[in-house]
Curated annotation (Swiss-Prot):
Keyword Calcium among UniProt keywords: no
Lineage start: Viruses, Monodnaviria, Loebvirae, Hofneiviricota, Faserviricetes
Organism annotation: Escherichia phage If1
Record's protein name: Virion export protein
Subcellular compartments: Host membrane
TM region positions: 320-340
Length: 429
């Protein structure tokens, strides 16, 4: 609702002075309420009376107030119907004709000395007395809806109520209602925020290796000179890094993702899980998800009324698989500060529970890179154990000798998850 910009300099006796009234987009209901309290006359407002009114520099005396009130209402499509009390309603030409019978001067004796002070934020707050102006601002480089909150905060720096910011016309214009001084300041401020956002291409390789896997990763991570990576890890050979059970990391120069894929293909003990690629704006999140939407039982109907063969169950569905979320921010110096959050969920083969069991591995961190550098994150270990029994039918049941025809085996599989992430600033042509 638009605010009322009013200046009612009426603190002295209404018997001797006129009321200087200035209204700018004032709610008509506030105006009627002020009139009722000023004259002491009860007024009923019809439910369909809505909208705003504007009046500039109207000096109204005590004898002119009823006529002024009725004229303002009629100019805005409303009328004051006679009665006890009178009713403010929409003007209907089929029912009413213009008449001054509703606006005869009110005797001075009906006023109680001084004019009562107007009530409500629109009348009482001095900071809303400024005149507001509405202008449009074309947005050339970003979406108007993204820029609107920034402009709104800028306008609220001054204590002037009634300022508004609306995105318009297919998100390429901003409609701004503010004071003249604010528009002048906004004209200088606007070009500093209406600038193109930098795009960031995030490429990733998510893979698993076994704890004993010793495939050579050096040609994928090292550069031709064999220089060490950030953090002091030697790129000549990363076997010890990739087979460690703790957290692993490294920052590499150059695009090593393609070479790392070749290294993974030559290893029989590595598994490529996903290769997400995300193009997003600086400061905006980018998300990649690949997996299944699995139902989990959350409740069952029990008791005599339950159908044993087909019981009623309530379920909830959750995504199980690989997910990657990044929020890159490009600094003025060209660095990339990136929030990284990844999850690798899988369904367990365990039968010890009555419902599905999921294995979860996740990483959430913030890294700082130069454009084109690659970071290695890892160390998420998953231990999988399985037991199997095999036997010869019938013969394995024979006492004493049946054990000779039965075999048992157990397998332990320890796999470690690694993530290679490369971020690169993409400039528009």
């Amino acid at each position: 609702m638009k605010k009322l910009l009013a200046s009612l300099l009426c603190v002295l006796s209404f018997q001797s002075f006129a009321i200087p009234v200035e209204l700018n987009n004032a709610p008509v209901r506030e105006f009627v309420s002020w009139y009722s309290k000023t004259t002491g006359k009860p007024v009923i407002i019809s439910p369909d009376v809505k909208g705003e009114i504007t009046v500039y520099s109207a000096d109204v005396t005590k004898d002119e107030l009823p006529q002024f009130f009725t004229s303002v209402l009629r100019a805005n499509g409303f009328d004051l119907s006679p009665g006890n009390p009178a009713v403010v309603q929409k003007f209907n030409r089929n029912t009413y004709e213009y008449s001054d019978s509703f606006s005869e001067p009110v005797p001075a004796s009906s006023y109680d000395g001084d004019v009562p002070p107007p009530t409500g934020d629109f009348f009482t707050k001095p900071e809303i007395r400024a005149n507001l102006i509405t202008q449009t601002y074309p947005v050339n480089n970003v979406r108007a809806k993204d820029l609107a909150p920034v402009i709104d905060i800028f306008l609220k720096g001054e204590n002037i109520a009634g300022t508004k910011v609306y995105p318009l016309m297919g998100r390429i214009f901003l409609l701004v209602t503010a004071s003249a001084s604010q528009h002048k300041e906004l004209a200088a401020f606007f070009p500093s925020v209406d600038v193109p956002r930098t795009q960031v291409l995030v490429e990733s390789v998510i893979f698993e290796t076994t704890a004993s896997d010793g495939f050579d990763f050096s040609f994928a991570a090292g550069d031709p000179s064999g220089s060490p990576v950030a953090g002091g890890i030697n790129t000549d050979r990363l076997t010890s890094v990739l087979s460690s059970t703790g957290g692993s990391f490294g920052i590499f120069n150059g695009n090593i993702l393609g070479l790392s894929l070749k290294a993974l293909e030559t290893s029989s003990k590595s598994t490529l899980l996903s290769m997400p690629r995300i193009l997003t704006m600086s400061g905006q999140p980018g998300t990649f998800t690949a997996g299944q939407n699995v139902p989990f039982v959350t409740g069952r109907v029990t008791g005599e009324a339950a159908n044993v063969n087909n019981p009623f169950q309530t379920i909830e569905r959750h995504d199980v698989g690989i997910s990657l979320k990044v929020v890159p921010v490009v600094t003025p110096g060209g660095l990339l500060i990136m929030d990284v959050s990844t999850n690798a969920d899988s369904i367990s083969d365990s039968q010890t529970a009555s419902d599905i069991i999921t294995n979860t591995r996740s990483i959430s961190t913030t890294v700082q890179l130069k454009s084109g550098q690659t970071v290695l994150l890892g160390g998420m270990v998953d231990n999988r154990e399985s037991d199997s029994d095999s036997s010869v039918p019938w013969v394995s049941k024979i006492p004493l000798i049946g054990a000779l025809f039965t075999s048992k085996s157990s397998n332990a599989n320890k796999r470690t998850l690694y993530i290679l992430i490369r971020a690169r600033v993409v400039n528009l042509l």
